Amino acid sequence: MLFTIASAIFFLSLNDGHAQAQTDESRRFEVGGQFSVLNASNGRASVTRVLPCLVPPCPTATSTSEGHETEPGFGARIGYNLTKDFTLEAEGNFFPREREFGGGRKSQALFGVKAGKRFEQAGVFAKARPGFVRFSEGDLSRPRPGIACIAVFPPPAACFEATPKTHFAFDLGGVFEYYPSRRTLIRFDAGDTIIRFGEHRVPIVIDPGSGSGVRQVVVGTAPSETTHNFQGSIGIGVRF
């Protein structure tokens, strides 16, 4: 997809000198694609267990789910310029890496505004775009069929089936654009993707502490919380 857009930009740049009659204000639509990175987690949970001992009270140990990880991805964007400096836009991204403890693959959709100042060869903007982020394996609340699990705490992750979970997101940040020609642009984004997590259950890796080195994967409840996650992208686009 990005190769196709890049090819279109190249040919449009070659022919741009023959289309000077069309003003920038008449180029209302923008389409493009981007590579993006999102530094996020699937919520944070912890479990506390009692370690075996001969004489009570026995000591306890707390294990916590994994923190933030940087996820590479790609996506597409479309915009409509209400004025030269104010744009309505929609963007979708897909992060294909499937990590067992990171909520699986992630997809993102954002819809909002971009406002700032566009100059002859560059533009600087702020953006505000609400939307959502979907984790393909974001919740471990559904019991796995056909598996009889003993009622122990913390419950083993093998007793549950991973299901998708969608959370509200809000993208706040800045945009810098460079215009190789009147029709084409190169875009750089940086911002804070705010994710509002609802309560859900996530896997936690624990060491039983027996000295055997055998790790166990259990399930813990991640409470409702709001997290701040850096997201950056670089992309290309065409105006028409």
PLM features: residue spans?
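Solvent-exposed loop segments that connect transmembrane elements
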Residues: 42-66, 137-163, 198-223
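Intrinsic low-complexity/disordered segments
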Residues: 15-19, 31, 228
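C-terminal beta-signal and adjacent terminal beta-strands/loops
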Residues: 183-190, 194-207
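Short N-terminal segments immediately surrounding and downstream of signal-peptide cleavage
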Residues: 21-37
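Gram-negative (and chloroplast) outer-membrane scaffold detector with strong preference
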Residues: 32-39, 77-170, 178-182, 186-187, ...
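Cleavable N-terminal export/targeting peptides
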Residues: 1-26
